[in-house]
């Protein structure tokens, strides 16, 4: 502001859109009555208030200056919707819309030339001559620790009088994939020797240290100060009073820093197809804590892994759709949260068994990488920070005592601010509502069977290990058979088909990668913990008992779609290598895949053949002796017909119209259809 008042033109650059949005909103708040066009946000804004402001963004300012173009554009779009694409008028409107877009774009560039304060990202500046060709007296580079040295040099070249780097060298470093030593690995503070000077207790002539913070509750700030800033960070006297309203409300009332310990719970961490990580129970518990806080405060959930943030974001969308009165819960990775703040932050660490070791985002000590990431997450919280992790897993992996995350665990362990698995399972019932509900076993069994009975299209069940209750297993088997009789698709995947109750085996297919007790009904209703199983963690030769098994129901199409993708629930081909048997020891051949396994032998080695599905969705036969035997074969009509008539002359019938099923060979290969008038079709993993 001082530079603007002195008549200087100022360019504010940052690495992230969130940071740029925050900077211009703060400047506008200081001088809200400035003439339109004095302050301009150029580029893609993300902040809701900024997007809705009449003239702070360059695009909105262009429309503010030329409202007639906006009206003409809206009228033309409405007219074009009613025209066929081949109409000459349709083409004419398209040309005029392009002209309007170009006129507005030119106007945006003019607003940049005339503004006193321009805020944008460094990447936008590099590619857009509208900023690059302007003259600025002062250039301020915010979040400079994230930038590469060449970007800093480029930004400095745009300043006529002053260049200021602002940032925290204890927070996010530049993102570099290579492990080699290079100037690109260092931030500007390391490159200039500022970091080494501070580490050794010396001053640096270029450094102006801002050592008073105005965001966090003092307990949060003190922990950050002790672990990352050598005790140099201080809080203003009124900060504790200002944040008391957040601390004294749920969740974990009375504590600015708290922890939710998932030890003794089946919080399974698995890798996704893009090599990220996801933990379903950890996400559910983190979200339940955030949901409790969202009744009164702005809440964010931060996680190291992109896949987990996508799952949490899907849950937030479902809750927002069902409960518009609640404040939207922001869910993102650490990098996406840089530059923003929330009243309450929930940090979901994700890592747990079955991962052999926590990922580098939690454990890397090189360049203090993990500490810098966690420091960003911690310092986003204004009043309350809640960590969520399986402490027993972290203890088992012997994390370095230099890690900020490990020091938080040690500081919270066995304190009233650290919720145990028992407290998490019981206390979550307080937030049960229309979208997310917690149940005890008996109540959960009843509601689960009710949802099965009300299913309309499909039921997908994953069972890791053996269900605990045989009585409930029989009730579930009856409910699933009834659903199949109504034409509902039922997919029951077991980690080990032979290990589940015999009443469920005829319905089951084997998939050794099933890891979570998750159910999806009609791709909308999600259950975790049903049917209740005896699943345990197996780690380094020992078996870890699970003491707490929460039963959770979540309703939301976005969440169901995310889980369907992350858990690869479309993979419904039986992976069994041995034939399952019933209580009397007879082979179960109630699916085509199990029939193939029991009756088809490899012509090369004599081992059973099994049905497989290619990446293109084509079914074929492969030897169970792979990789020793590479024998494969096509599936022919005769084999499918023999399966249909395995129990006698009546054959197999369509579950939707009760007409006979038949196998045929068409232009695109083998297909199954019924003989009824509607010709219902089935895939080989559906019969």
Label the model's feature ranges.
Residues 4, 28, 294, 484:
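Gly/Ala-rich phosphate-binding loop of Rossmann-like dinucleotide-binding domains
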Residues 9-135, 175-187, 243, 317-320, ...:
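Conserved P-loop NTPase motor core of helicases/translocases
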Residues 20, 41, 118-121, 140, ...:
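Short, hydrophobic beta-strand segments that form beta-sheet elements in well-ordered domains
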Residues 42, 166, 348-349, 380, ...:
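Generic beta-sheet signal
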Residues 65-85, 352-378, 522-525:
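Extended, charge-rich low-complexity interaction segments
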Residues 424-617, 621-687:
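PLD/PLD-like phosphodiesterase catalytic module centered on the HKD motif
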């Amino acid at each position: 502001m001082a530079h603007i008042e002195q008549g200087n033109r100022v360019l504010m650059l940052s690495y992230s859109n969130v940071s740029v949005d925050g900077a211009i909103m703060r400047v506008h708040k200081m001088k809200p009555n400035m003439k339109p066009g004095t302050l301009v946000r150029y580029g893609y804004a993300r902040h809701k208030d900024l997007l809705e402001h009449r003239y702070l963004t360059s695009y909105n300012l262009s429309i503010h200056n030329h409202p007639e173009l906006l009206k003409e554009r809206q009228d033309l779009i409405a007219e074009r919707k009613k025209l066929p694409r081949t109409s000459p008028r349709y083409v004419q409107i398209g040309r005029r819309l392009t002209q309007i877009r170009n006129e507005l774009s030119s106007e945006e560039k003019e607003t940049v030339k005339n503004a006193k304060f321009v805020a944008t990202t460094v990447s936008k500046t590099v590619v857009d001559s509208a900023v690059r060709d302007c003259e600025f007296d002062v250039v301020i580079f915010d979040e400079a620790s994230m930038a590469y040295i060449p970007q800093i040099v480029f930004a400095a070249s745009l300043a006529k009088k002053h260049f200021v780097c602002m940032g925290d060298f204890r927070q996010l470093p530049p993102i570099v994939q290579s492990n080699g030593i290079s100037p690109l690995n260092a931030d500007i503070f390391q490159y200039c020797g500022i970091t080494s000077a501070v580490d050794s207790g010396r001053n640096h002539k270029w450094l102006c240290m801002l050592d008073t913070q105005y965001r966090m509750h003092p307990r949060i700030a003190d922990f950050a100060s002790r672990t990352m800033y050598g005790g140099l960070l201080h809080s203003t006297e009124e900060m504790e009073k200002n944040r008391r309203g957040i601390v004294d409300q749920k969740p974990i009332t009375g504590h600015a820093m708290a922890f939710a310990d998932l030890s003794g719970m089946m919080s399974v961490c698995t890798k996704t197809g893009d090599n990220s990580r996801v933990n379903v129970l950890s996400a559910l518990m983190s979200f339940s804590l955030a949901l409790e806080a969202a009744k009164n405060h702005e809440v964010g959930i931060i996680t190291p892994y992109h896949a987990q943030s996508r799952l949490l974001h899907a849950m937030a969308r479902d809750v927002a759709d069902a409960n518009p009165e609640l404040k939207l819960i922001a869910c993102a990775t650490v990098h996406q949260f840089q530059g923003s703040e929330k009243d309450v932050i929930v940090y979901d660490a994700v890592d747990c068994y079955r991962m052999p070791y926590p990922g580098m985002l939690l454990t890397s000590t090189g360049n203090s990488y993990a500490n810098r990431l966690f420091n960003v997450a911690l310092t986003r919280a204004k009043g309350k920070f809640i960590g969520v992790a399986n402490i027993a897993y972290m203890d088992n992996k012997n994390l370095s005592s230099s890690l900020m995350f490990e020091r938080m665990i040690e500081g919270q362990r066995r304190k009233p601010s650290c919720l145990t698995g028992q407290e998490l399972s019981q206390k979550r019932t307080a937030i049960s509502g229309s979208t997310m509900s917690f149940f005890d076993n008996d109540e959960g069994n009843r509601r689960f069977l009710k949802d099965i009975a009300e299913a309309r299209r499909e039921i997908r069940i994953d069972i890791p290990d053996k269900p605990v209750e045989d009585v409930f297993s029989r009730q579930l088997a009856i409910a699933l058979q009834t659903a199949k009789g109504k034409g509902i698709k039922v997919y029951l995947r077991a980690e080990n088909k032979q290990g589940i109750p015999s009443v469920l085996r005829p319905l089951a297919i084997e998939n050794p990668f099933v890891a979570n007790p998750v159910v999806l009904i009609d791709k909308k209703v999600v259950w975790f913990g049903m049917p209740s199983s005896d699943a345990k963690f197996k780690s380094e030769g020992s078996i870890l008992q699970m003491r707490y098994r929460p039963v959770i129901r979540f309703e939301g199409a976005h969440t169901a779609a995310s889980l369907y993708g992350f858990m690869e629930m479309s993979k419904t081909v039986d992976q069994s290598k041995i034939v399952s048997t019933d209580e009397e020891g007879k082979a179960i051949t109630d699916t085509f895949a199990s029939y193939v396994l029991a009756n088809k032998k490899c012509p090369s080695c004599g081992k059973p053949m099994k049905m497989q599905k290619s990446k293109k969705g084509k079914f074929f036969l492969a030897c169970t002796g792979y990789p020793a035997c590479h024998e494969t074969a096509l599936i022919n009509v005769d084999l499918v017909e023999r399966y249909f008539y395995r129990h006698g002359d009546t054959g197999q019938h369509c579950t939707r119209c009760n007409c006979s099923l038949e196998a045929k060979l068409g232009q695109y290969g083998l297909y199954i259809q019924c003989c009824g008038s509607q010709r219902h079709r089935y895939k080989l993993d559906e019969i």
